[in-house]
């Protein structure tokens, strides 16, 4: 009897030791799993925070610009010229037409959809020079972002400027027709959309990355004042 009892005790002791060992192993596994999950969650949170902070830094950098530096020769309010020699190069032997417009004007966008491409094509073919002059007639936030980016592209990537210009107006036309002001009445949203349009029309990313949110306030004041004071045949006195 004594031997049987001792054997049972030994078995129970061994079983208890095995249970305790398994419990310790389970605890270690739980600790490892919790630690790994915690590290992963913290890494995800840190990554998201970095992306958000980086995006805010990019926006602030695009907001805090020197318009004179960004716009270069266009800072004085001059138009973008299109002619047979390219963008920014008028042919002095040809007559020069001037088109005044606002990137947030639906009538301007409709006009561009109807005849804009033809006008710039004829200028490129040498029938005339055309001055394409952004002014304020409506003045939504989209006008500011679009004008700023347009003037950057005119300097840094003139070969894509004409396509970009028409695409900017085409986008506004779609938003007006849809009665959707979500983007065009918000400066940051307009800036992001303008960058997308630029990329879609072939503007290099290193140029797109330099687009300011808005460097056009003084430019538009100057160009609008010049337009209002211009002697334009057939125009009334309502401006």
Explain the meaning of each model-derived region.
Residues 137-239:
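Cysteine-centric redox/oxidoreductase cores and disulfide-bonded domains
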